[in-house]
Regions:
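Non-ligating segments of multi-cofactor redox enzymes
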Residues: 1-247, 252-253, 259-498
Length: 498
């Protein structure tokens, strides 16, 4: 019963979180967005100490249920491992005990903590579990999902139905796509062969929670008086943490999947209070008190350091002709969405899960290929602009990189300023009248003034009122000049309230 309950809850969480990344309408986030906000690393970066405390207490009481139920990357590994067992039934009992690779676990955590505190997010986000799953879902699963949607839309259109509508199918930048494919391939290979190897060797969140789970009140426990040492529980343990020979369980690696309990035919393994007479399981390799103290210090450094860092920073047209996209302008200062407060706050808090990219209905947010903010979202106005009436990205960010803003608040936030390059303007290059930027500016920050001040009848060119401009990018997106637009938006380091 415990195993079935765990599988049901894991299936619910995995399905809902995956749908958050696949949903291009933005309708599911109002109901399911909280599932993204309870992921551990985003909660730490968002300074959601209540959620962090709840997850820590839950781990101390129940063990690593976060890894077996809530973490989508962990459940993905379980699905891959399950398929292997179903396809090759002789390998259903393929697991065996292996000593903990402590040096690798602590090396990865030791690499993770300082890089997180120093703001080297690219290195951190390559191994962060929620970030990794987000990239896999956005760059691998989502394009397949959208292709299926477009096929249904094509069929529906033939029968005069509008139940579906077509949407753009795109993948991230080449570095992001490569990182997603490599991560998925590596995780697939490890899970296919060894179950939860990634969680217990590479994943820093697994190592942190493993420290707490060593002292969990409830856990699978072996009754040595009943145990016949048949080895079935060990062969079903995807965490490779059960040593049948010695009757020991390494609780720092146990993900509380309940497979051992379900497999044992003698009732020798039960989920019980570890400190009752029933429980005779030793702590295996993780029993040394010195290791426990070092582990708590390392975990505490991550939580306290990240929280302090976050606290300090918080003070501070349709047509029939082919349309050629404009070349990306070289901005001196990148753009960050409204609600991110500043460029630094955005880059330091973003976990690159790319949930905002999936949610953006205007195709403004795309993964960055720049080294300093690799795989984090960046704003680009070649396919759309940041509409003042849209605040979806601020509502779905689980890490506090983009904080919630209302529609009214967004209209008063200046994220950038439009800059005019008259050398590219079609008024000068082609000698035609335009004014497209001024007509579509939602803030009325652009006016058309005579090219020749002494001749009121001369062609007019755009002039930007920097105090009114909010940096939405409508002017840049709709400018007809090619290959470079005659107007583009430069970001500002710290957002201003108008």
């Amino acid at each position: 019963m415990l195993r079935k309950t765990r599988i049901f809850l894991a299936a619910v969480f995995f399905t809902c979180i995956t749908l958050l990344f696949l949903d291009f309408t933005g309708t599911l986030h109002a109901w399911l967005g909280w599932m993204a906000k309870i992921q551990l690393l985003p909660a730490i970066l968002a300074l959601n100490l209540g959620i962090v405390a709840i997850l820590a207490i839950m781990t101390v009481i129940f063990g690593r249920v976060y890894c077996s139920i809530i973490c989508p990357l962990g459940v993905l590994q379980d699905i891959i491992s399950w398929f292997h067992g179903r396809m090759q039934k002789k390998n259903r009992f393929r697991f065996s005990y292996s000593p903990a690779k402590k040096w690798l676990r602590w090396f990865m955590l030791g690499l993770f903590i300082p890089t997180l505190l120093l703001g080297a997010n690219a290195a951190v986000l390559l191994i962060a579990p929620y970030s990794t799953f987000g990239r896999i879902a956005t760059n691998i699963f989502a394009p397949i999902y959208r292709l299926g949607n477009n096929a249904l839309a094509w069929i529906a259109e033939r029968v005069d139905s509008y139940a579906f509508y077509s949407t753009e199918v795109w993948v991230g930048t080449l570095p992001t796509l490569i990182a997603s494919i490599v991560a998925f391939g590596l995780i697939f290979a490890l899970a296919w062969k060894n179950g939860r190897t990634w969680c217990n060797t590479v994943c820093p969140v697994g190592t942190i929670l493993g420290v707490l789970s060593r002292f969990s009140l409830l856990a699978p426990a072996i009754n040595k008086d009943k145990c016949t040492k048949c080895g079935l529980c060990e062969k079903q343990c995807k965490a490779a943490c059960i040593n049948t020979k010695n009757g020991e369980i390494d609780y720092s690696r146990c993900v509380t999947c309940m497979n051992c309990i379900n497999t044992c035919k003698d009732g020798a393994v039960k989920y019980a209070f570890r400190y009752k007479p029933f429980c005779h399981a030793e702590r295996s390799e993780a029993s040394a008190d010195k290791v426990g103290r070092r582990a708590f210090m390392a975990s505490g450094a991550l939580l306290i350091g990240a929280a302090a860092k976050a606290q300090v920073e918080s003070k501070l047209d349709g047509g029939l002709v082919e349309v050629s996209l404009a070349s990306k302008p070289k901005r001196k200062t990148p753009l960050a969405p409204a609600g991110s407060l500043s460029l630094k706050n955005f880059e330091n808090h973003c976990v690159a899960c790319q949930l905002c990219i999936t949610t953006c209905p205007n195709d403004v947010l795309r993964p960055s290929s720049s080294l300093h903010n690799l795989m984090q979202p960046e704003m680009n106005y070649d396919k759309g602009f940041c509409r003042p009436e849209c605040n979806k990205c601020s509502l779905v960010c689980p890490a506090g990189a983009i904080r919630p803003v209302t529609i009214e608040e967004k209209s008063s936030v200046q994220i950038g300023i439009a800059v005019v390059d008259l050398d590219n303007c079609v008024v000068n290059t082609d000698g035609v009248r335009c004014g497209n930027c001024a007509r579509h500016c939602p803030a009325k920050a652009i006016t058309m003034v005579p090219k020749d001040p002494s001749n009121e009848k001369s062609h007019k060119i755009p002039a930007v009122n920097e105090h009114k401009c909010i940096g939405c990018g409508a002017c840049e997106n709709l400018c007809p000049a090619r290959p470079f637009t005659a107007i583009h938006v430069e970001g500002i380091e710290v957002h201003k309230i108008k």
